[in-house]
Protein backbone atom coordinates (compact mmCIF):
# COMPACT_ATOMS: atom_id res chain seq x y z
CA UNK A 1 0.00 0.00 0.00
CA UNK A 2 2.77 2.46 0.86
CA UNK A 3 4.62 2.07 -2.41
CA UNK A 4 8.01 2.50 -0.78
CA UNK A 5 11.00 1.78 -3.04
CA UNK A 6 13.21 -0.71 -1.22
CA UNK A 7 15.16 -2.21 -4.10
CA UNK A 8 14.76 -3.19 -7.69
CA UNK A 9 13.08 -6.22 -9.17
CA UNK A 10 11.66 -7.57 -5.94
CA UNK A 11 8.65 -7.43 -3.71
CA UNK A 12 9.01 -7.23 0.05
CA UNK A 13 5.92 -7.81 2.20
CA UNK A 14 6.02 -6.47 5.76
CA UNK A 15 3.57 -6.02 8.58
CA UNK A 16 3.20 -3.51 11.41
CA UNK A 17 5.79 -5.40 13.47
CA UNK A 18 8.49 -4.46 10.96
CA UNK A 19 10.43 -1.33 11.83
CA UNK A 20 10.89 0.69 8.67
CA UNK A 21 13.84 2.59 10.12
CA UNK A 22 15.56 -0.75 10.75
CA UNK A 23 14.68 -1.84 7.19
CA UNK A 24 16.38 1.29 5.86
CA UNK A 25 19.38 0.62 8.12
CA UNK A 26 19.57 -2.99 6.88
CA UNK A 27 19.57 -1.96 3.22
CA UNK A 28 22.07 0.85 3.82
CA UNK A 29 24.36 -1.63 5.60
CA UNK A 30 24.08 -3.98 2.62
CA UNK A 31 24.82 -1.16 0.18
CA UNK A 32 27.76 0.06 2.24
CA UNK A 33 29.23 -3.45 2.27
CA UNK A 34 28.73 -3.85 -1.49
CA UNK A 35 30.21 -0.49 -2.44
CA UNK A 36 33.49 -0.82 -4.35
CA UNK A 37 34.77 2.29 -2.59
CA UNK A 38 36.10 3.95 -5.73
CA UNK A 39 33.96 7.07 -5.56
CA UNK A 40 33.79 9.28 -2.49
CA UNK A 41 30.02 9.97 -2.54
CA UNK A 42 29.14 6.29 -2.37
CA UNK A 43 31.96 5.22 -0.05
CA UNK A 44 31.69 8.06 2.46
CA UNK A 45 28.07 9.08 1.94
CA UNK A 46 26.62 5.63 2.59
CA UNK A 47 28.93 5.24 5.60
CA UNK A 48 27.59 8.51 7.04
CA UNK A 49 23.98 7.56 6.29
CA UNK A 50 24.48 4.17 7.96
CA UNK A 51 25.96 5.82 11.06
CA UNK A 52 22.93 8.13 11.35
CA UNK A 53 20.48 5.24 10.89
CA UNK A 54 22.32 3.17 13.51
CA UNK A 55 22.09 6.06 15.98
CA UNK A 56 18.36 6.37 15.30
CA UNK A 57 17.57 2.66 15.85
CA UNK A 58 19.70 2.72 19.02
CA UNK A 59 17.64 5.55 20.50
CA UNK A 60 20.33 8.19 19.95
CA UNK A 61 18.73 10.03 17.05
CA UNK A 62 18.86 13.82 17.04
CA UNK A 63 16.87 16.70 15.66
CA UNK A 64 18.03 17.27 12.08
CA UNK A 65 18.88 13.62 11.35
CA UNK A 66 16.00 13.17 8.90
CA UNK A 67 16.98 16.27 6.96
CA UNK A 68 20.64 15.20 6.94
CA UNK A 69 19.67 11.77 5.58
CA UNK A 70 17.67 13.39 2.78
CA UNK A 71 20.49 15.82 1.98
CA UNK A 72 23.06 13.02 1.87
CA UNK A 73 20.70 10.94 -0.29
CA UNK A 74 20.39 13.75 -2.83
CA UNK A 75 24.14 14.29 -2.95
CA UNK A 76 24.96 10.59 -3.31
CA UNK A 77 22.32 10.04 -6.01
CA UNK A 78 23.52 13.05 -8.00
CA UNK A 79 27.26 12.44 -7.76
CA UNK A 80 27.89 8.68 -7.49
CA UNK A 81 29.59 7.08 -10.47
CA UNK A 82 27.70 3.78 -10.70
CA UNK A 83 24.16 2.41 -10.53
CA UNK A 84 24.64 1.08 -7.00
CA UNK A 85 25.66 4.50 -5.72
CA UNK A 86 22.95 6.35 -7.63
CA UNK A 87 20.23 4.12 -6.11
CA UNK A 88 21.86 3.45 -2.71
CA UNK A 89 19.70 5.93 -0.83
CA UNK A 90 16.35 4.94 -2.39
CA UNK A 91 15.28 2.73 0.56
CA UNK A 92 16.03 5.52 3.03
CA UNK A 93 14.25 8.21 1.00
CA UNK A 94 11.25 5.93 0.40
CA UNK A 95 10.88 4.97 4.05
CA UNK A 96 11.19 8.60 5.15
CA UNK A 97 8.58 9.62 2.57
CA UNK A 98 6.09 6.92 3.55
CA UNK A 99 6.95 6.35 7.22
CA UNK A 100 8.30 9.67 8.49
CA UNK A 101 6.24 9.27 11.67
CA UNK A 102 8.29 6.16 12.54
CA UNK A 103 11.54 8.09 12.18
CA UNK A 104 10.12 10.89 14.33
CA UNK A 105 8.99 8.42 17.03
CA UNK A 106 12.50 6.96 17.17
CA UNK A 107 14.17 10.37 17.33
CA UNK A 108 11.85 12.47 19.49
CA UNK A 109 9.99 9.92 21.63
CA UNK A 110 12.79 7.32 21.81
CA UNK A 111 10.35 4.55 20.91
CA UNK A 112 9.91 2.12 18.05
CA UNK A 113 6.23 1.95 16.98
CA UNK A 114 6.79 -1.60 15.68
CA UNK A 115 8.42 -2.65 18.95
CA UNK A 116 11.30 -4.13 16.97
CA UNK A 117 14.28 -1.99 17.99
CA UNK A 118 15.80 -3.73 21.00
CA UNK A 119 17.47 -0.62 22.43
CA UNK A 120 14.16 1.26 22.44
CA UNK A 121 12.15 -1.41 24.24
CA UNK A 122 10.98 -0.75 27.77
CA UNK A 123 10.12 -3.59 30.12
CA UNK A 124 8.19 -2.49 33.18
CA UNK A 125 6.19 -3.90 36.08
CA UNK A 126 2.57 -2.85 36.58
CA UNK A 127 2.45 -2.26 40.36
CA UNK A 128 -1.28 -3.05 40.60
CA UNK A 129 -0.70 -6.52 39.13
CA UNK A 130 2.56 -7.38 40.90
CA UNK A 131 2.05 -9.57 43.99
CA UNK A 132 5.69 -9.36 45.07
CA UNK A 133 6.46 -13.06 44.57
CA UNK A 134 10.07 -12.22 43.55
CA UNK A 135 10.11 -14.80 40.75
CA UNK A 136 11.16 -12.14 38.23
CA UNK A 137 13.94 -10.88 40.46
CA UNK A 138 15.38 -14.36 40.91
CA UNK A 139 15.36 -15.12 37.17
CA UNK A 140 16.83 -11.79 35.98
CA UNK A 141 20.36 -12.52 34.71
CA UNK A 142 21.63 -9.00 35.49
CA UNK A 143 19.81 -8.35 38.80
CA UNK A 144 17.92 -5.41 37.32
CA UNK A 145 14.77 -6.18 39.33
CA UNK A 146 14.49 -5.34 43.00
CA UNK A 147 11.86 -5.09 45.69
CA UNK A 148 10.49 -6.61 48.86
CA UNK A 149 8.49 -9.82 48.96
CA UNK A 150 4.73 -9.17 48.93
CA UNK A 151 5.29 -5.63 47.59
CA UNK A 152 5.53 -4.53 43.93
CA UNK A 153 8.99 -4.96 42.41
CA UNK A 154 10.66 -2.45 40.07
CA UNK A 155 13.00 -2.73 37.08
CA UNK A 156 16.14 -0.61 36.92
CA UNK A 157 16.09 0.43 33.24
CA UNK A 158 19.80 1.24 33.27
CA UNK A 159 20.62 -2.39 34.12
CA UNK A 160 17.89 -4.15 32.12
CA UNK A 161 19.15 -5.98 29.01
CA UNK A 162 15.59 -6.56 27.76
CA UNK A 163 15.98 -10.32 27.49
CA UNK A 164 12.34 -10.92 28.45
CA UNK A 165 13.05 -13.69 30.98
CA UNK A 166 11.08 -11.80 33.62
CA UNK A 167 8.03 -11.47 31.37
CA UNK A 168 7.87 -15.22 30.83
CA UNK A 169 8.43 -15.99 34.52
CA UNK A 170 5.70 -13.74 35.95
CA UNK A 171 2.66 -15.85 36.93
CA UNK A 172 0.54 -12.69 37.35
CA UNK A 173 1.32 -11.13 33.93
CA UNK A 174 2.46 -7.99 35.74
CA UNK A 175 5.47 -7.40 33.51
CA UNK A 176 4.83 -5.65 30.23
CA UNK A 177 6.85 -4.56 27.25
CA UNK A 178 6.44 -1.28 25.40
Locate the predicted segments by residue.
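Redox cofactor-anchoring modules in respiratory/redox and cofactor-processing assemblies
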Residues: 1-122
